């Protein structure tokens, strides 16, 4: 095996995290995978040492302009770009190249959802990159075009999917996700300045306005008898990375907490990157930083008769780059866990 990988948008947070993971991948360490073109736009001509000093193995590599002809000489192409740019590049690449898109361009199936939340030409949808969703692992493994999920939908979907599939909650769910600032990307903005974010929490794009809302609904509705209505509220926190999600929904019956836990334990029994915590222990972002894990806890509110599920992921790893590498592994036919850390970084 001799796999040559390119990254478009290599100097962004997602691109840099993909590089970090590839550098510890067994295929790279054994010489079976090489890191080819590192492409960008605003950082063209700068070295990895300048942009990402935490990756000394690539310190002398230079970011080059995005060029489709150069990409055609690669086996795997990661697109780590803002939405709207991936589709134009992807349509010019040969079908035999594995293209893994970290943007939103190919996530949504419904043209109306795309028009309402993104606008512009809808490029269609690709196999969706959450392998833990029943049926998706095989689709990913057999595909050369894969859409990496959004970070918020990853935490919310994994939190609610077993309950939806078991039909134990009503089709109206509430999701509140607290996120670190790296989710906004590297582009400079006043709202992301330290003076604006440190010591403060702020909700944004509330009341169904966030672009990840239809993606969460799409994922959950796939396993329900009807469309799942999602009320999604993101909250910005003064953290570099991490997402803590609290999802609630009305229980449909008098099911016990022990029975709910059993549903979740069975659903994720064979999933290497999902961990159901012991009773009474709550997920925390620190425990998953730098890892491809999702930590989950389930509970039942006796007062409101609601299911309460909390989940924690690293938005840059399981929420983006880790999912991308996980999908690459499946597409290449190697171990799904290759190069993906399960342990977080603490303190």
From Swiss-Prot:
Presence of the UniProt keyword ATP-binding in the record: no
A Pfam entry, by short name: Semialdhyde_dh
Alphabetical UniProt keywords: Amino-acid biosynthesis, Arginine biosynthesis, Cytoplasm, NADP, Oxidoreductase
Enzyme Commission identifier(s): 1.2.1.38
InterPro entries per the UniProt record, alphabetical: AGPR_AS, AGPR_type-1, NAD(P)-bd_dom_sf, NAGSA_dehydrogenase, Semialdehyde_DH_NAD-bd
Chief localization: cytoplasm
Described purpose of this protein according to its UniProt entry: Catalyzes the NADPH-dependent reduction of N-acetyl-5-glutamyl phosphate to yield N-acetyl-L-glutamate 5-semialdehyde.
NCBIfam families: argC
Protein's recorded name: N-acetyl-gamma-glutamyl-phosphate reductase
Organism field: Corynebacterium diphtheriae (strain ATCC 700971 / NCTC 13129 / Biotype gravis)
